[in-house]
Amino acid sequence: MGMRMMFTVFLLVVLATTVVSFTSDRASDGRKAAAKDKASDLVALTVKGCCSHPACSVNNPDICG
């Protein structure tokens, strides 16, 4: 294999590695966003549950308004 061919193969490997790394990183960002949405939904349900109980709503007027 010539020097030029080896350099071309090297560049192709670097490009392929970069593309795979970039796409997998973006996929993990999506999973993180989905987990964050689930957590905020859970917090909202917990607050709503607290506000429906008189004792809890009295102790947390800043949340239940």
Curated annotation (Swiss-Prot):
Disulfide bonds join C50-C56, C51-C64. Changing S52T: Decrease in inhibitory activity towards human alpha-9-alpha-10 nAChR. Residues 52-54 are annotated as: Ser-Xaa-Pro motif, crucial for potent interaction with nAChR. It is found in: Secreted. InterPro entries: Conotoxin_a-typ. The modification Cysteine amide is found at C64. Negative results: does not or very weakly inhibit mouse muscle alpha-1-beta-1-gamma-delta/CHRNA1-CHRNB1-CHRNG-CHRND nAChRs. Does not or very weakly inhibit rat neuronal alpha-6/alpha-3-beta-4 (CHRNA6/CHRNA3-CHRNB4), alpha-3-beta-4/CHRNA3-CHRNB4, alpha-4-beta-2/CHRNA4-CHRNB2 and alpha-4-beta-4/CHRNA4-CHRNB4 nAChRs. Does not or weakly inhibit human alpha-1-beta-1-delta-epsilon/CHRNA1-CHRNB1-CHRND-CHRNE, alpha-4-beta-2/CHRNA4-CHRNB2, and alpha-7/CHRNA7 nAChRs. Alpha-conotoxins act on postsynaptic membranes, they bind to the nicotinic acetylcholine receptors (nAChR) and thus inhibit them. This toxin potently and reversibly inhibits alpha-9-alpha-10/CHRNA9-CHRNA10 (IC(50)=92 nM (human) and IC(50)=8.3 nM (rat)) and human alpha3-beta-2/CHRNA3-CHRNB2 nAChR (IC(50)=218.9 nM). Also moderately inhibits human alpha-3-beta-4/CHRNA3-CHRNB4 (60% inhibition at 1 uM), rat alpha-7/CHRNA7 (65% inhibition at 1 uM) and rat alpha-3-beta-2/CHRNA3-CHRNB2 nAChR (50-70% inhibition at 10 uM). In two rat pain models, this toxin shows analgesic effect. The cysteine framework is I (CC-C-C). Alpha4/7 pattern. Belongs to the conotoxin A superfamily. This is Alpha-conotoxin Mr1.1. It comes from Conus marmoreus. The lineage of its organism: Eukaryota, Metazoa, Spiralia, Lophotrochozoa, Mollusca.
